[in-house]
Amino acid sequence: MTNPQDDDYTMPAFAPVSRRMLLGATAGTLSGLPTTGHAQPGSDWPNQPVRYINIFPPGGATDTLSRLYCAKMSEITGQQFVVENRSGSGGNVGVDAIAKSRPDGYTIGLGSIAPHAIAPTLYANLPFNASKDFSFITGLWQLPNLLVVNNDLPARSVPELIALLKANPGKYAYGSSGIGTTPHLSGEMLKQMVGTDILHVPYRGGAPALLDLLSGRVQLIMDNIPGLLPTAREGRIRALAVTGPQRSPVAPEIPTMAEFLPGFEITSWGAVCGPAGTPGSVVARHSAFAKQALEHPDLVRSFQELGAAPWWTTPEEIIGFRGREEARLAPLIRASGARVE
């Protein structure tokens, strides 16, 4: 079986993203950060540029969101946050590089549902331990998938789609950006909750899956909102639902899957992490800076324009969330039969 492909589209923008947000690098304020009367290791973090490893390729949704975050962190801290793309094996190559970096706070990167919650069950062997080899700092964003269907499919709503699938087991196919990606697991969750057979057709990324949806080779896909919503708004495909727990602010007219199938939720998420052993004082300072960045109106607006929700958490909250996600998704992955040896 081939490795899962990176769960990421080359992303058309919903609204212009300013050069300042993407490249920013002006000195900012340190207000709002905890201070103590005695210097501690890392108490002046960051006092040099910070390398941020994005585990997915350039040009996709995660790349744009990561660069927006790093630009805002550069602005707030006065130090450059430099994005380095290290993609491959569904994000595993990049997170392994994070895990093996020096734990001083100056190499951080993107944690994600793919390597940190899906890979531990999907892969027979990993070069890292998702629960032990990282210092998690904060959540970063949550980005639901969008269920879209070919215009020729006789289903204009989720209930109509469910009825069609149940009446025709094995007749229809869904495409995904690869084995073990959130589009794959979204389709598997639909299959299991509806109780019928739907053929899974994995592709090497989201773009070829969308092309085959447009041509009718597959009838439905569920992938990140940025890669699908513009095509749906052009009328070339039909959007039926989002897979997050709430309706998306970028498309509030589209219902959630859970409105029809209670408990249905698959949301891509990002987090900021460094290697295990990063000093607690560095984690605390980074977390405080991250809160300023992720609550800044400019960043909130830019994230939401891309269909993502900014998501600040404490380090303890993101650690607990990651563990719960791995436990929640493991039965779904096993039931799908997906396994990478």
Predicted features and spans:
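Conserved helix-loop-beta element of the AMP-binding
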Residues: W45, S135, L161, E234-S248, ...
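Hinge/capping helix and adjacent helix->loop/strand transition within the periplasmic-binding protein
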Residues: K100-Y106, I113, T121-P208, M257, ...
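N-terminal (or domain-start) structured segment
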Residues: G37-D133, K171, T196-L220, W312, ...
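N-terminal secretory signal peptides
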Residues: M1-V17, M21, A25-G32
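Short loop/turn segments at beta->alpha junctions
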Residues: S18, G90, S157, P202-G205, ...
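A ligand-binding cleft/hinge motif common to bilobed small-molecule-binding domains
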Residues: P115-N125, K191-M193, L220-P252
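An extracytoplasmic/periplasmic, membrane-proximal ligand-sensing/linker region
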Residues: W45-P49, R233, G280-E341
